[in-house]
């Protein structure tokens, strides 16, 4: 098993990536290079930074990548709030995605704390 797959933080981020990709399929075409792309990139970045950090040798390097992942998750939170405000996402869908984002952020933060 790849080293990153054992972390709940990565597992939650991976689920979030898939959910964001599905949810953004229905965004307007004019948002393809805007909010659609930004939301997808932020979600993907969170998971990808955990993957990259897990491949590093030292704890400090891993913590650095976890910091980047946390920033990406915060960026995604804002993108989802904008998408809901613009009515690209139904309130229920936005709430589900935001709950997933919060869960992913929590486990990523806990993983970072465990690296002390």
Protein language model regions, located:
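Amphipathic alpha-helical assembly/interaction segments
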Residues: 1-116
